[in-house]
Amino acid sequence: MQLSTTPNLEGFTITEYCGVVTGEAILGANIFRDFFASIRDVVGGRSGAYEKELRKARQIAFKELQEQAEDLGANAIVGIDLDYETVGKDGSMLMVTVSGTAVKVRR
């Protein structure tokens, strides 16, 4: 499946718009793990534990997005937008949302 943040794909013609598709992932934060991660992992302003969780959430959201597009018969998604947000009491959870337009394309 072709994925693009732009409204079209170079070298392809959009033949049909199938609809808007979305993917979401909400991951809870482990307080003790996060505390120790802040001590152990933060080197040069980066936290390996947080980066791993972000990557995991992003993969889940994109998988949902592609599954919805496939269910609509699409072979590409254009106009993809990816957002991150903390939710829950004291920002205890991470939410990743991704959306785009499922389309059928041909060369």
Swiss-Prot record:
Question: Where are the disulfide bridges?
Answer: none
Q: Which InterPro entries is this protein grouped with?
A: UPF0145_dom_sf, UPF0145_YbjQ-like
| Pfam families xrefs | YbjQ_1
Protein origin, superkingdom: Bacteria
Give the record's family classification.
Answer: Belongs to the UPF0145 family.
Show the NCBIfam families listed in the entry: PRK02877.1 (NF002776)
Write the protein's name: UPF0145 protein ECA2666
